[in-house]
């Protein structure tokens, strides 16, 4: 017992101990950090009052957590305070205040030794919540630290490969919708740091490595943790199981589950892999069967490493089988009976032997046949297994299917579309009414054999004819469906009726039927009044309630309605055919039996509740027209008539009804007014007045209107037709006498009965063109004329008056008849009365404000088209009538088989006697019943027909008849038309009398016209519409079928009677199509619009812009001005000879969009390029704006910068030629890779308005080509080629045989002679070249072309740096092909690809494409253009176009700029090219040019106007760059002296003149040069042979002087003029002796080759002579100057010193013919300066300088010392000068022999040594003699030396950017100073 008690006590104690308070962690491990204190919270599980303490305050500190103001805490924060990096332990005590119980926790501090990551999974799924990863730390013993709160860690996601996308990303807890932010890392996320917990989210499938490291310096040794995490996707393969045939393919779809929905994945991340490639193989997602069998297809992820075996991807089962059976079915109902409008799919399926359906791809196809008129195919699969379509036409058709030897057939039956009416029905439910309701459902379509089904037969039954009968009895039956409504009420019953085809019951239509009890009755609509014997339709609506709203019954014919009438004037009749109004279910059809008023009450009782409604009804007499009885009015303009109506609705005084009367008519034609009168009768009258011509209906309507919704309009109306017409015929009625032979009755005889008052009443009737009598003619003016016997008509000779008789009807006036009343004393024989309707009564019309037509009663002449007033007249003969029987007296009839003319006889009695002047020409027949005269031609000729009226006493009528045929045919039409369009051709027929044939348009076949088209495939001709054609014209329509030219003619007749028109040549052209189709421009840019198609030649093409504020067009260049969109419209106009007007024969339009340039981008073909390679860099606009557009912008600044100039450099394509584009033209540049490295190219663009676009950059990497350095490699020939190219191998030896290596993979093929063909495959191959004892391996690599590069062929250079291309330049470019590394491909290929080009403006640049991938540009015009060069076949070429900016301007170094010259012109060409370039002329017989100097002379002219001579400078023969000048040479047909009158002094005279064409009115010199002085220096003597000079005189004295002068023609280079030179052959004294003091006049004439000449008059005034010609000063003694000449000239001579400070000239004396002057020298005369004496003679117009030559070797003090005789004195005096001259000559000879011994010998100019030359002439001639006589040599027999030295001054005038050519010469002397 004690043991038991002890046991119980121990258990109690144990339980108490177990329930005592405890700390949450009795042992805690915390980490140590240098600059971080780690916190950890200890907590007692019972919230009592505890005091906290620590055993080691140096290791840790304890901070209690107090709640409110209490000093008790059951929680405390332990903080690590030590930084000692070793393991220590401290104890935390928690003492309970009340009990003293102490709790302890051991806190261990230590350093972190390792890390580890804890997570629930190492796999993430796309589109799922991010996963949390938590880091844990451990000490050296593997114990885990309790907390890492507040410690920062480095988390890094590393991808296994750089090419794979990032698999996952960090996600903060704040951004995650699935997580809350943990308190321990809340501060870290705010600071953007990462702690010990993190979220990772998968964004792409793949595997990534997550590395976690500690950034603290004290823990750098801790090894980072690496965790591999895979990101997967929820993916399935569709189809999962499929059977295909061998060779066929099936496409698998990869579907990913995202947000519970499947999405198709179409990126390249996933790929499929087949398990057994012998059964099937894959290409992308398409599997192709290879052999019969079964295998699996697995899904692989490219982002997943090959070693990842985390998860086997989804798979599909693929079976390859052979077809065993073919089936056919009609989906979706699997029934071959259908109706129109149904959509079906005809399924043709193959099945394997095991019954598996075979899925077909595109390899095989099933043939099918179906009549698409029955079943319209909308779509079909490529393999033919599914035909999607719609049933279209009723009928039966067969559907066939076949596959190889398998076939199948089915019969498709299509019926009319199935329809059911009505589709929604609401019916009454009344348990007291057992009468079933019958409701007819109407079905249509199908085969009319329907199956009807009731949704609930207990409620409604339906028979086989669609008639439904309600059978509802007890709504509580279990078979009755009662539905609960929204308002809590119950639907009595609901069921459906369905109709279906009997043969295919899946094709059906459904109607819904609802049964409800009635709630309200209402008469919804009723016409409360009606006419007698007409009906009142009372529409009764009964309403039920559903969902708190009323719903009308569809039908309630089974309900019994009670009708109660107050007066029995209506009776109920059957309502068959009456359609109920809206919301009415029953119609009461009541017939009116009596006139009166009644009240009707309609009621119905339901469940002791009476539902009723009341309405008042009225009956009246029907509305009718009283007058006119025929209910039709015919009036002329301005006349009126009254119309009377009776009965109809009347005003009611018992209901609030308003009677409404209205009329409807055309107010332009009629004016209507209502007549107001007081009458007891129910009469209404209106007056209608015709305002203008036309027909209209006058409708009178009257009804009563009630302001209630149930009111139904019952309108009474009567319509009267009113004709407002022109008068056309006048009829006069009286009693007449007839012939005895007349078969007419005697009552219409012409017997006049005289009354007692001698009055004659003639009834007047005016009819319109339809012979309708006008009811009132008061607005017409009638003129009356009278004649007795044979007298002419006279007006107003007999008293007469015109009256209108009226009648009255119910007080309304109505017209009766119009009469002409005459008063005659007697009636003469043949008394005639003629009435004429000539005009309107303008006064009456003015009263009504009516303006009648002008001319009055005008009709149109069908022949002339003019409007004229017809003759409206008639006459009465009291004893004889002279009526016109025929409308004309002449007519022509066309002779043709079965052709006849029919003439109506409108006048006369109708009984005629016919007589022909000649028989056999025409046959005449007359039908008295129809009164038609029929003329049938028999042969060509002329005959006269006489017609006599058998009743009337009138003269016979005569008709002249000509029977004609077709004499000529003329065709008028346009000669050009667009393909598929039509033009009209007018064929004019002329008869045999050369008159236009009157063509009967209704009998065109009688003319036997036929057309003959030379080529019927080009155009077709058919007969056109024959409206609005002229006399003798037939319209045809010509349709263009295809492009081409052909001839067409029209002909008629056969044999000798055949007549044909002249052939008409017609061109059918293609439609004009503008290009480019749709363009996008920026403001300021331009583009050229061009067109294809149109007629040839197209001389009238007009291109315009719709919105000129957006863009404008000049010529064909469109320039953008404003943002927006506009259209460019091109029209081709041709004159239509038919209409005589210009017509648009073809047009097209394109859209131009003007957008803002927001930015640019740099496009380069490569971003990695090897050193030394060159590639283009081009600016493109955003988005995708071509350089072709940007290159046309004006005033745009583009700057290019390179971050590393040592890595790459930028230059433009013209740099090698000396053209450096400035910023405005750098749209495209070249990039050359220099050294390995990385560089950034930046392009900045500033627009014309100052807008700076964002800079565009591109990063380039330049790498070094991999080469073998050690050991030294043997260099082997290797070829880099493009696919589909041909190369010819050639070695240095003969008899070499080429073949492929035995291990060749077939990439290329080679012939034994070395012709290599590359194929489409890429890769490397090896060719072996073998001889008898050697072999050479030749490697060849076939690579795709990455880009093309256009390079200027460096053949020409410019002298000076240019920033634009000089106009006239011709460049040659080559196009190189490069691979993806920048290597140039071998393209010694014959027609590798061919080039094509695009130009911004095609008119400014001439492009010539060569066969060797080169092209030439001819820049003859200034332009701001861009050319794009590309390959014609760019297959496989990624960057197949290169762009070059062409900025061409007129260069200052280019001369001449004009192009028209005439014979005799000397042209000094100037070129910006270097002096080494050569000049050439295309025809040296016309223009000869020195090939070195560029000086040309025009020798002759071309006979053809406009033919050009080409002058080139450069290297044209080697296809290099060159300049070209196009010269147009014209005949010199005008010669003109500079002066017409002049004076000359006698010894010599030169008359300057100019030779030119008559159009060159502004030409004054024949030397055309930019630098005349320079050109003159280089120009030698010029032979002149195209004009001659003659001297003549009119008086005897002048004729005596002619023999003393020599006259010749010459060219003076110094002044650039041609001259006629006179040279005196005798002495001057002899000339003076003859002339003496007389005035002598001579005439100088210059004559060109064709005799055109000009003359000038010369007055001979002998000049003065000065002696000595120079004064040599040896001392200061005076000198005498003698001047001889005529006395009259000497008296006016002026002699002046050049400087009066140092010497003076004094007059001494004047004798006969001689004047003397003294020269006085002053002592201070400087002898080292130049002085002269100036002699001026005004009469002879001479100015002579006499130089004073001083001796500087002698000092002034020695002037009196003499050394012997004069000779010795002279020698000693000039000894210094002689010695100096000798030394200079010797040195010059030595230099010449040393440096210029290879040069030609300079010709001596002997003109310099002739006597009688003035100083000025000597200087000029000496200057000319020092020049190269190159031009003279050019035209003389002497040979021209090409190495002739130019003068130094000329060389110095040039500047070169490539160095002086002579300085660069190899034989130049090092010490030469010629160019210094």
From Swiss-Prot:
Stored InterPro entries: Ig_NUP210_4th, Ig_NUP210_6th, Ig_NUP210_9th, Invasin/intimin_cell_adhesion, NUP210-like, NUP210_Ig1, NUP210_Ig2, NUP210_Ig3
Cited SUPFAM superfamilies: Invasin/intimin cell-adhesion fragments
Domain of life: Eukaryota
Post-translational modification: Glycosylated.
Region Disordered, annotated ranges: 1819-1876
Composition bias type Polar residues, residue spans: 1819-1829
Cellular-component GO terms for this entry: cytoplasm; nuclear membrane; nuclear pore; nuclear pore inner ring; nuclear pore nuclear basket; nuclear pore transmembrane ring
Record keywords: Cytoplasm, Glycoprotein, Membrane, mRNA transport, Nuclear pore complex, Nucleus, Protein transport, Signal, Translocation, Transmembrane, Transmembrane helix, Transport
Positions annotated as glycosylated: 39, 383, 547, 776, 882, 1412, 1571
Protein name: Nuclear pore membrane glycoprotein 210
Transmembrane segments: 1776-1796
Job of this protein: Component of the nuclear pore complex.
Topology, Cytoplasmic side: 1797-1876
GO biological process terms held by the UniProt record: mRNA transport; nuclear pore organization; protein import into nucleus
Spans within the Perinuclear space topological domain: 21-1775
Tissues expressing this chain: Expressed in adult male accessory glands (at protein level).
Record-stated family: Belongs to the NUP210 family.
Signal peptide: 1-20
Cell compartments where the protein resides: Nucleus membrane; Nucleus, Nuclear pore complex; Cytoplasm
Bias (Low complexity) ranges: 1864-1876
Membrane topology term: Single-pass type I membrane protein
Organism: Drosophila melanogaster (Fruit fly)
Name of the encoding gene: Gp210
The keyword Transmembrane helix belongs to this UniProt entry's keyword annotation: yes
């Amino acid at each position: 017992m004690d043991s038991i008690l002890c046991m119980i006590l121990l258990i109690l104690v144990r339980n108490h101990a177990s329930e005592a308070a405890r700390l949450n962690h009795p042992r805690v491990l915390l980490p140590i950090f240098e600059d971080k204190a780690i916190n950890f919270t200890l907590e007692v599980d019972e919230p009592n009052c505890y005091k906290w303490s620590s055993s080691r305050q140096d290791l840790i500190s304890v901070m209690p957590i107090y709640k409110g103001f209490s000093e008790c805490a059951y929680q405390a924060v332990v903080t690590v305070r030590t930084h000692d990096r070793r393991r220590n332990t401290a104890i935390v005590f928690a003492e309970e205040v009340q009990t003293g119980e102490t709790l302890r926790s051991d806190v261990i501090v230590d350093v972190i030794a390792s890390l580890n990551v804890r997570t629930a999974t190492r796999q993430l799924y796309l589109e799922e919540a991010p996963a949390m990863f938590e880091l844990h730390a451990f000490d050296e013993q593997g114990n885990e630290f309790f907390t890492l709160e507040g410690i920062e860690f480095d988390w890094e996601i590393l991808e296994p490969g750089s090419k794979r996308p990032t698999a996952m990303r960090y996600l903060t807890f704040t951004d995650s919708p699935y997580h809350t932010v943990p308190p321990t890392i809340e501060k870290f996320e705010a600071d953007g740091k990462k702690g010990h917990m993190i979220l990772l989210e998968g964004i792409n499938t793949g595997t990534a490595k997550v590395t976690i490291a500690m950034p603290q310096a004290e823990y750098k040794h801790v090894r980072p943790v690496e965790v591999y995490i895979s990101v997967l996707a929820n993916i399935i393969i569709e189809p999962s199981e499929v059977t295909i045939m061998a060779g066929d393919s099936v496409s698998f779809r990869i579907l990913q589950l995202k947000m519970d929905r499947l999405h198709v994945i179409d990126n390249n991340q996933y790929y499929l892999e087949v398990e057994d490639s012998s059964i099937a193989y894959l290409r992308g997602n398409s599997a192709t069967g290879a052999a019969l069998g079964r295998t699996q297809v697995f899904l692989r992820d490219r982002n997943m490493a090959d070693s990842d075996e985390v998860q086997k991807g989804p798979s599909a089962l693929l079976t390859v089988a052979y077809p065993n059976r073919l089936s056919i079915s009609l989906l979706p109902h699997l029934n071959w009976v259908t109706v129109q409008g149904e959509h079906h799919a005809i399924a043709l399926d193959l099945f394997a032997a095991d019954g598996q359906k075979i899925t077909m791809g595109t390899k095989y196809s099933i043939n099918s046949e179906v009549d698409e008129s029955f079943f319209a195919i909308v779509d079909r699969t490529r393999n033919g297994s599914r035909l999607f379509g719609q049933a279209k036409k009723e009928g039966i058709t067969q559907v066939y299917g076949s596959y190889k030897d398998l076939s199948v057939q089915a019969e498709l039956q299509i019926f009319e579309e199935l329809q059911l009416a009505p589709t929604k029905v609401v019916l009454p439910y009344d348990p007291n009414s057992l009468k079933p309701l019958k409701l007819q459902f109407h079905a249509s379509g199908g085969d009319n054999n329907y199956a009807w089904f009731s949704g609930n037969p207990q409620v409604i039954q339906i028979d086989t004819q669609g008639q439904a009968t309600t059978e509802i009895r007890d709504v509580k039956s279990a078979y009755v469906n009662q539905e609960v409504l929204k308002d809590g009420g119950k639907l009595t019953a609901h069921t459906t009726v369905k109709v279906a085809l009997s043969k295919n019951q899946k094709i059906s239509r459904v109607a819904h039927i609802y049964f409800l009890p009635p709630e309200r009755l209402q008469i919804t609509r009723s016409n409360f009044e009606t006419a007698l014997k007409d009906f009142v339709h009372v529409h009764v609506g009964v309403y039920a309630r559903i969902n708190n709203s009323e719903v009308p019954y569809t039908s309630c014919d089974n309900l019994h309605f009670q009708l109660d009438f107050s007066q029995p004037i209506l009776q109920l009749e059957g309502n068959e055919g009456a359609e109920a109004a809206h919301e009415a279910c029953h119609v009461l059809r009541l017939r009116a039996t009596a006139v009166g008023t009644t009240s009707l009450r309609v009621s119905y009782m339901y469940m002791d509740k009476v539902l009723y409604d009341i309405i008042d009804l009225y009956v009246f007499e029907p509305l009718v027209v009283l007058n006119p009885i025929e209910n039709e009015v015919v009036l002329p303009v301005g006349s009126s008539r009254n119309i009377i109506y009776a009965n109809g609705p009347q005003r009611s005084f018992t209901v609030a009804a308003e009677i409404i009367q209205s009329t409807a008519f055309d107010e332009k034609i009629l004016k209507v007014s209502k007549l107001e009168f007081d009458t007891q009768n129910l009469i209404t009258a209106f007056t209608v007045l015709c305002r203008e011509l036309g027909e209209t209906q006058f409708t009178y309507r009257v009804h009563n209107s009630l302001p209630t919704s149930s009111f139904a309009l019952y309108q009474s109306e009567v319509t009267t037709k009113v004709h407002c017409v022109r008068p056309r015929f006048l009829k006069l009625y009286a009693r007449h006498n007839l012939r005895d032979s007349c078969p007419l009755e005697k009552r219409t005889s012409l017997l006049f009965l005289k009354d007692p008052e001698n009055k004659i009443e003639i009834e007047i009737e005016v009819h319109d063109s339809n012979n309708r009598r006008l009811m009132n003619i008061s607005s017409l003016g009638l003129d009356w004329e009278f004649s007795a016997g044979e007298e002419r008509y006279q007006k107003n000779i007999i008293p007469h008056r015109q009256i209108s008789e009226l009648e009255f009807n119910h007080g309304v006036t109505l017209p009766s008849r119009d009469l002409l009343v005459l008063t005659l004393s007697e009636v003469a024989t043949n008394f005639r009365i003629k009435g004429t309707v000539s005009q309107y009564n303008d006064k009456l019309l003015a009263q009504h404000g009516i303006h009648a037509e002008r001319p009055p009663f005008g009709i149109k002449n069908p022949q002339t088209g003019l409007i004229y007033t017809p003759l409206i007249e008639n006459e009465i003969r009291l004893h004889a009538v002279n009526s016109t029987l025929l409308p004309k007296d002449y007519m022509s009839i066309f002779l043709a088989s079965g052709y006849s003319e029919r003439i109506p006889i409108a006048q006369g009695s109708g009984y005629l006697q016919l007589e022909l002047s000649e028989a056999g020409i025409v046959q005449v027949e007359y039908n008295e019943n129809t009164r038609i005269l029929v003329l049938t031609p028999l042969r060509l000729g002329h005959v006269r027909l006489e017609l006599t009226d058998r009743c009337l006493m009138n003269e016979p009528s005569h008709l002249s008849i000509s029977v004609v045929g077709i004499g000529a045919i003329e065709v008028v039409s346009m000669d050009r038309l667009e393909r598929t369009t039509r033009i009209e051709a007018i064929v004019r027929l002329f008869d045999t009398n050369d008159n236009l044939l009157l063509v009967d348009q209704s009998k065109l076949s009688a003319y036997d016209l036929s057309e003959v088209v030379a080529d019927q495939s080009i155009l077709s001709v058919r007969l056109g519409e024959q409206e609005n054609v002229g006399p003798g014209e037939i319209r045809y329509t010509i349709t263009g079928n295809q492009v081409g030219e052909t001839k067409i003619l029209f002909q008629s007749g056969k044999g000798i009677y055949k007549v044909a028109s002249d052939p008409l040549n017609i061109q059918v052209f293609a439609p004009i199509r503008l290009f480019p189709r749709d363009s996008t421009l920026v403001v300021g840019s331009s583009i050229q619009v061009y067109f294809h198609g149109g007629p040839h030649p197209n001389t009238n093409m007009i291109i315009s812009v719709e919105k000129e504020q957006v863009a404008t067009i000049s010529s064909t260049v469109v320039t953008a001005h404003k943002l927006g969109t506009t259209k460019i419209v091109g029209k081709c106009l041709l004159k239509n000879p038919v209409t005589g007007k210009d017509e648009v024969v073809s047009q097209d339009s394109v859209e131009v969009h003007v957008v803002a340039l927001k930015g640019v981008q740099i496009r380069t073909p490569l971003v990695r390029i090897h050193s030394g390679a060159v590639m283009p860099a081009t600016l493109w606009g955003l988005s995708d704006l071509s350089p072709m557009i940007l290159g046309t912008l004006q005033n745009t600044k583009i700057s290019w910068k390179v971050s590393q100039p040592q890595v790459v450099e930028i230059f433009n394509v013209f740099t090698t030629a000396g053209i450096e584009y400035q910023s405005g033209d750098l749209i495209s540049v070249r990039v050359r890779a220099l050294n390995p490295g990385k560089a950034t190219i930046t392009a900045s663009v500033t627009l014309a308005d100052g807008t700076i676009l964002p800079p565009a950059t591109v990063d380039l990497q330049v790498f070094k080509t991999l080469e073998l350095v050690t050991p030294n490699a043997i260099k082997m020939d290797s070829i880099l080629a493009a696919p589909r190219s041909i190369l010819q191998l050639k070695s240095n030896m003969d008899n070499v045989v080429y073949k492929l290596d035995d291990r060749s993979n077939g990439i290329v093929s080679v012939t034994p002679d070395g012709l290599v063909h590359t194929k489409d495959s890429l890769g490397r191959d090896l060719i072996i070249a073998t001889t008898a004892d050697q072999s050479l391996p030749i490697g060849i690599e076939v690579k795709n072309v990455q880009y093309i590069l256009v390079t200027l062929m460096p053949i020409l250079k410019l002298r000076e740096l240019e920033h634009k291309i000089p106009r006239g330049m011709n460049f040659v470019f080559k196009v190189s092909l490069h691979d993806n590394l920048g290597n140039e491909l071998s393209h010694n290929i014959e027609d590798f690809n061919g080039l094509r080009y695009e130009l911004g403006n095609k008119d400014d640049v001439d492009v010539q494409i060569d066969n060797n991938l080169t092209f030439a540009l001819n820049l003859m015009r200034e332009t701001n253009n861009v050319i794009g060069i590309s390959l014609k076949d760019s297959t496989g070429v990624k960057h197949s176009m290169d762009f070059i900016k062409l900025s061409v301007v007129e260069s200052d170094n280019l001369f001449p700029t004009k192009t028209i010259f005439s014979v005799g012109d000397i042209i000094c060409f100037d070129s910006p090219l270097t002096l080494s370039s050569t000049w050439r002329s295309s025809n040296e017989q016309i223009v000869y040019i020195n090939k070195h100097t560029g000086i040309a002379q025009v020798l002759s002219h071309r006979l053809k106007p406009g033919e050009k001579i080409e002058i080139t400078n450069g290297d044209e023969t080697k296809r290099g760059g060159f300049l070209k000048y196009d010269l147009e040479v014209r005949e010199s047909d005008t010669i003109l002296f500079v002066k017409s009158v002049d004076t000359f002094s006698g010894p010599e005279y030169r008359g300057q003149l100019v030779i030119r064409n008559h159009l060159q009115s502004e030409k004054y010199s024949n030397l055309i040069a930019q630098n005349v002085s320079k050109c003159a220096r280089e120009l030698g003597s010029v032979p002149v042979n195209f004009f001659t000079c003659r001297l003549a005189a009119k008086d005897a004295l002048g004729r005596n002087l002619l023999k003393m002068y020599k006259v010749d023609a010459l060219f003076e280079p110094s002044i650039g003029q041609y001259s006629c030179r006179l040279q005196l052959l005798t002495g001057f004294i002899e000339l003076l002796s003859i002339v003496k003091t007389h005035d002598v006049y001579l005439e100088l004439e210059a004559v060109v080759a064709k005799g055109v000449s000009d003359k000038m008059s010369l007055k001979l005034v002998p000049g003065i002579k000065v002696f000595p010609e120079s004064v040599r000063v040896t001392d200061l003694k005076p000198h005498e100057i003698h001047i001889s000449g005529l006395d009259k000239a000497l008296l006016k001579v002026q002699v002046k010193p050049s400087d009066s400070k140092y010497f003076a000239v004094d007059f001494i004396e004047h004798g006969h013919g001689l004047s003397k002057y003294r020269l006085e020298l002053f002592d201070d005369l400087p002898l080292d300066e130049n002085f002269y004496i100036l002699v001026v003679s005004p009469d002879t117009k001479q100015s002579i300088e006499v130089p004073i030559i001083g001796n500087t070797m002698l000092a002034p003090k020695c002037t009196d010392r003499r050394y012997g005789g004069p000779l010795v004195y002279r020698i000693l005096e000039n000894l210094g000068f002689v010695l100096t001259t000798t030394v200079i000559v010797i040195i010059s000879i030595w230099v010449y022999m040393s440096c210029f011994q290879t040069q030609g010998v300079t010709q001596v100019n002997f003109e310099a040594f002739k006597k009688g030359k003035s100083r000025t002439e000597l200087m000029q001639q000496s200057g000319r003699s020092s020049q190269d006589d190159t031009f003279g040599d050019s035209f003389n027999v002497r040979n021209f030396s090409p190495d002739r030295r130019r003068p130094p001054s000329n060389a110095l005038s040039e500047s070169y950017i490539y160095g002086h050519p002579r300085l660069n010469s190899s034989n130049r002397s090092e010490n030469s100073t010629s160019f210094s």
